[in-house]
Amino acid sequence: MGILKTILAASLVFGGASSIAVQAEAEQIGYGRLIVNDFLGDGQDRWRSGSIVGSHLYGQPWGGQRPEGFGDLIEMRIMGQVIAPDNLQSPDPTDRPYAGALSIGAHTHFERSGFDIALGADLTLVGPSSGIGDIQTWLHNAFSVAEPSDTVLNNQVGNKLALTGVAEVGYIYELSENARLRPFVEARAGDETLLRAGFDFTLGQFGHDELLVRDPVSGQRYQTTYQNRPGWSFLAGADFAVVQSSIYLPASSGVTIEDTRERYRIGMNWQGESTSVYYGATWLSPEFTGQDEGQVVGAVRIRFDF
């Protein structure tokens, strides 16, 4: 996947200057966020333990579809996540190491010949310097939950800085007024390097004429622009990835990475006049050879318009 990484990096570098110029003239036109946590899925606190992602959109007023120009719509994204062994107090030596990651990035969303395209980059800080371990310790203390032990934190993935390029291309098939199917392909190179293909199915108005952004951990998509059409929506999706590397599973940890991954997800959204509630669940296949089972993570978003 070396060629893939080179192509992604080049496109991001050469597109960066024009994107910054557009953003300087643009206004904020949307926002979105999603909380993902293992406890909200299978009730555990392990592996892909928890994350929160937030997006702010800049560009011309949203007209119901992506612009055709590269850089005309910019998403600024920030994300923090915790990756942990199964036992935060006395981990199995064959389990994955603890990792805290904090990232910030810019992504552009546009349309070409009917295809939805997202292309961007994130700068990710991994390790104790991210402060994620301290935040989790504070939160667990506040809620009287077992915190990561000194052994876990002292053996976490060391400080690293990774530039990650991400590209996704999808195409929407309108099956009916309320049903849509969107197959997609994704390439990622940096903190994790992989190729992924999958689909998203929606029954209802969720995402119709709205910009949806994909959460990197769960694969769930969340709204960043809103048409506020009342009613229920139901979602399902799946994807398969071929994985080359992950800085969250370094060879020095003694853990062997699985070379494929699968994700299967469902979700539902209720949209009222001024309030919406989203919940989704995703089954994640094992990511390393010592992981004896998959896990289910839950995703939630509650939005109020005042």
What are the roles of these predicted feature ranges?
Residues F39-G41, Q60-G64, V82-L88, G127-G133, ...:
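Gram-negative outer-membrane beta-barrel proteins
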Residues Q23-Q28, Q60-L73, E111-A118, I172-L181, ...:
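Short loop/turn motifs that connect adjacent beta-strands in outer-membrane beta-barrel proteins
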Residues Q23-G64, G69-L73, I78-S90, D239-P250:
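Short glycine/proline- and aromatic-enriched beta-strand/turn motifs that initiate or cap beta-hairpins
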Residues R46-I52, D72, Y98-L102, I117, ...:
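Residues that define the transmembrane beta-barrel architecture of outer-membrane proteins
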Residues Y31, F39-G41, N87-Q89, Q205-F306:
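Outer membrane beta-barrel transmembrane domains
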Residues I52-Y58, I104-F110, L123, G165-Y171, ...:
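Residues on the lipid-exposed face of transmembrane beta-strands in outer-membrane beta-barrel proteins
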Residues Y31-N37, I74-V82, A121-G127, V169, ...:
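Transmembrane beta-barrel strands of outer-membrane/channel proteins
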Residues G69-D134:
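Long, hydrophobic/aromatic-enriched structural stretches that serve as scaffold segments
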